[in-house]
């Protein structure tokens, strides 16, 4: 079952001064080869795509981490996915939870729409405020679910600040 895609976000990823489109999607609780895709805003052709371990539903935000003049992509979703992706070629810069364990076992659940705030850690990059919570694997009748929480993440390293 494919889920509803994230809101389309736009920025120029190929240097042609036309905004390109980044969108997330995927399948709930399933690895997907095409869950993050970037499309050329001029002709609609695929610029790059990335796989993910679970559904990606957060709207992408952009900031140039690689100093190549092209915005890099930050996008989020289920199973502790908060990713920084090279906007030029789609390669992974960092993954907040890159481990081969269930993020829920570590108290990390779904990441929702990231937002940039000021530079909290002094590295000259705007950092990320994001909410995390909502154990989608828990039964609907379970009343004592873990609470969600707000987190501040370094956009440059992907490390937790607060």
Residue ranges and their predicted role:
Residues 15-24, 67-76, 122-131:
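Acidic/hydrophobic-patterned starts of short beta strands in beta-sheet-rich repeat architectures
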């Amino acid at each position: 079952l494919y889920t509803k895609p994230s809101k389309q976000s736009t920025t120029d990823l190929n240097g042609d001064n036309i905004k390109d489109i980044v969108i997330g999607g995927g399948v709930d609780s399933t690895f997907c080869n095409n869950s993050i895709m970037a499309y050329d805003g001029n002709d609609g052709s695929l610029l790059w795509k990335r796989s993910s371990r679970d559904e990606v539903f957060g709207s992408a935000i952009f900031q140039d981490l690689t100093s190549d003049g092209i915005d890099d992509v930050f996008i989020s979703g289920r199973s502790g996915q908060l990713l920084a992706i090279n906007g030029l070629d789609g390669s992974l810069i960092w993954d907040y939870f890159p481990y081969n364990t269930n993020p829920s076992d570590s108290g990390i659940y779904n990441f929702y729409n990231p937002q940039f705030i000021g530079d909290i850690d002094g590295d000259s990059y705007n950092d990320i405020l994001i909410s995390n919570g909502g154990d989608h694997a828990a039964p609907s009748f379970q009343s004592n679910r873990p609470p969600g929480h707000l987190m501040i993440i370094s956009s440059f390293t992907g490390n937790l600040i607060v």
